[in-house]
Structure formats: structure tokens, C-alpha cells
């Protein structure tokens, strides 16, 4: 079961972040602790992200909303790139930021706007 979750987790991470970034992210965490890296890959990406109840794009929106509300800019940047890779548009992310600004506050929205600019500028 763990091997299957590892495989599913890496497939999902590759879909989100691309092969190079998925492998680099996993290796970075393995440098910290191999068990922790494997646990995150299995549980977060292999078990939770691949559950049948929600589409991957919806899970991506939920993740971005949580990271924005928590003020986690570096992780938000990673997941905004993933969202764009899934086909979520810049305008859809913009609407998420506007909507969430009323629940998490203007400062978190301004930070998310900055992050979105960093992510989408090179794509123009």
C-alpha cells in the first residue's frame, strides 16, 4: 500500500509541479528527513489529493485559499504555479484572491497579489 501511495503521490506532484520540480521538492525534504518526505508524499499527495470526492482543480483552489489565509507566501507561490499547470487561469486565481480578501483580510490579499505577479510575470 505504501509503495502505491508513493507512486500516486509522485504522479500527482508531477501533474501539479512538473517532473523536475516534483523530484526536486521531494529530494529537498529527503535531505531533511527521508521518513518525513515519504510520509508527506504518501499522505498529502498520494492519499488526500487523489481521493475521489473532489476534482484536482478544486483541491488546488482549496489549497491556495488555505495558504493565502494563513499567509504562507512561499508555499502559495508553489501552489499557484501548480494551479496554472492544471489549467486554472490567472483570472480565476485573481477572483479567488478578491473573494478571500473579505474573509482573510486585505493584507493577505495584497501578499497573494504580489505572489501571483511573481508567478505569472515570466509567463507573459
Q: Where does each model-flagged region fall?
A:
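Acidic, glycine/proline-rich low-complexity segments that act as flexible tails and inter-domain linkers
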Residues: 1-57, 85, 109-124
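Short, structured motif recognition centered on aromatic/hydrophobic residues
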Residues: 59-67, 96-97
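Short alpha-helix boundary/capping elements
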Residues: 66-72, 104-105
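Extended intrinsically disordered, low-complexity coil regions enriched in Ser, Thr, Gly, Ala
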Residues: 73-92, 110-114
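Short acidic/histidine-centered micro-motifs embedded in hydrophobic/aromatic stretches
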Residues: 96-100, 115-116
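C-terminal structural segments of small proteins and small subunits
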Residues: 101-109
